[in-house]
Structure formats: structure tokens, C-alpha cells
């Protein structure tokens, strides 16, 4: 497309079907003369919630479903666990693919998705319920419980689990960084959410390796990811200029 042609015009090489962390590593890139490396893999690895029933055939992860929704048969009634943009994407996609009753369950009295994404989901016919936690998944649907908050939105108590009938449960509550590049690169560390830790300039604890977007912040909007990437790109230029001035 025109963006790809623009990149080639600028002298940028594109190497398709190449994974960093397999046959090639970050160390290999530095060995061959790269001065800085940007990691923008996104948060495209499902992260388990550690609840009973996640292995059942009627339980799916949002990141897997969104990659190829046509191979899934979710049924008429779908429960979507989570309140981020990926949860909205799952809900809207399920409606478009034929599911009739799609409900999004948020853990708090609010959402982490953008207001626009929520508006689109509601317009498409999705329902949203707030202050719901997930206890487990059964063949008949998820076991949820009510979460009670005070006026300052501090959690006060949680109710007993109850069944919400659903043909399928899609977990869109947690995603983490692809771990292959992390496992094979010293100095890249993750926080407890599985996201890459960076400083204010987007540099990881490995000098010269930078990162931004979903892999750092978690699933969010393209606008935010692009904004962060521009900031980090400028920091990478400064980093290289400073290193070259010392040599």
C-alpha cells in the first residue's frame, strides 16, 4: 500500500516473517551495527486470569478471537469479561458475526475503553453491566459476583458467585507482551501485569532498547500508541546523537 511504498522511499527496509527472539535476537541486531532498537510488538499474548474453567471449550481469549473470529462459534448469548477497547471490539464483532445477546461485564463502575468505543458498542446492540467480577467459567456460562464500592470508588465488599447463562465467555480483561523477545533479551523486565518497564524516554532497562504502545501501557487506542511512539522516536534520536558525540 502507499504507506509501505513511503517507507521504501525513505530507505527503510522491511523484513517480513522474521521473529526477533527465535533464530535472531536483540544481541544479534546490536552485533550487526544497530544503535537503537524499538520494540512495538503490542500486547498480543493472552494472559490467564487463573480461574477455574479457562480451559473449557466455551471460554476464549479476546486476543485469539479477534485474530480470526470466523473460526469461532460463540452462539447466541455471549459474555465478555473486561471493559477495555479489546472488550468493545469483541462485543461488536460477536454481534456482527451473528450473536444476538452480547453483554460486557466491567469490574468497576466505569470503563477503561474510550467513550467513543463504548458508544459504538452500545449502538451495535451490546449491553454493559458494571461492578462485576468473575469467579470461574462453567459449561453453562460464567460465575460472576457483585462488587460493591463506596462513593469514592473504594471496594467495600464482594457478593457470592452466581451463574450468568451464556453460550460462550470471552475474556478480554488481561493481555501481556509477547514473551519470546523478552525471554531472549537480558535487561528487559516486565511489571506484574506482564507489560514492559520503561523510563520517561521509553527506554527499557537494556540500554539502546526502546518500547512504546500497548506493550508498555496495555491495550489502548491507536491515537495514544502513535503519540507515545513519536515521543520515543525522538528520544532514540537523542540517544544516538549523544552516543556518537562521545565517540
For each predicted feature, which ranges?
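Rossmann-like dinucleotide-binding cores of NAD(P)H-dependent redox enzymes
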Residues: 1-10, 91-135, 243-247
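Feature captures the FAD/FMN-dependent oxidoreductase FAD-binding
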Residues: 2-52, 135-142, 168-170, 175-181
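General small-molecule cofactor/ligand-binding pocket signal
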Residues: 13-17, 60, 127-129, 210
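Phosphate-coordination loops involved in phosphoryl transfer and adenosine-cofactor binding
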Residues: 17, 74-78, 131, 206
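FAD-site-proximal beta/loop scaffold in flavoenzymes
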Residues: 55-75, 157, 165-219
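Rossmann-like NAD(P)H-binding beta-loop-alpha module
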Residues: 73-99
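Cofactor-binding loop segments of dinucleotide-utilizing enzymes, especially the Rossmann-like FAD-
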Residues: 83, 106-109, 214
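A conserved FAD-binding loop/helix module that cradles the flavin
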Residues: 90, 212-243
